Amino acid sequence: MLAALKTNLNDIHHVTVMNRRVRVLASHLAAQITGGGSVLDVGCGDGSIAQAILAQNGALAFRGVDVFLRPRVAIPAQVYDGATLPFSDGAFDWITIVDVLHHTDHPGRVLAECLRVARRGVVVKDHLRDGLAAETTLRFMDWVGNRGHDVRLPYNYLSTPDWRALFARIGARATRWTTDLGLYPAPFSLLFDRGLHFVATIEKA
């Protein structure tokens, strides 16, 4: 019964969320990546978000890395170990990392490694454990979106003060920050948007 429920939820999630999510996220990310240059997408998945950003800014050149490489990826991509990016310091102008950090045990280490490789900045999309029942809501969203897809689910969500403290700890700062993303259509937005997500540009302090 649980398996059937999960299958039904996956179908609903794909129809109502995924296509819109790619389009909306690409718009927010593209707005924070100014000009052209090289971009490394960390945790690139199937490359659909990078592809959607390219449709808005053809002056960018994307490459992807992930701990598990899918059979089809829309951008050139390679496997990495999830800890050390196989590139020299400042190898890329930008890094994008979308809904990856909360799947790691040490998000500060992962973000610091991204900052090492990025010349201009790291554009992060992740969650905020802010507000009523935020933890429960985020866990449910992660379970629906990722369970059964070989994705680690440590549910490592941070609040806004936690993120600010993390940035300070690794010698970084947020130069742009937005929580008004509009990822979900009504009525789902009332439960699943409500300040639970952010996109930010992180630079070395």
Residue ranges and their predicted role:
Residues 1-27:
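Class I SAM-dependent methyltransferase Rossmann-like catalytic core
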Residues 36-45:
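Conserved class I S-adenosyl-L-methionine
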Residues 46-84:
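Class I SAM-dependent methyltransferase SAM/SAH-binding core
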Residues 51, 127-189:
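C-terminal alpha-helical "lid/dimerization" subdomain adjacent to the S-adenosyl-L-methionine
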Residues 96:
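A conserved beta-strand element that flanks and buttresses the S-adenosyl-L-methionine
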Residues 99-100:
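Short catalytic micro-motifs in class I SAM-dependent methyltransferases
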Residues 104-113:
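A short, conserved alpha-helix within the catalytic core of class I
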Residues 120-127:
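Conserved beta-strand signature within the Rossmann-like core of class I S-adenosyl-L-methionine
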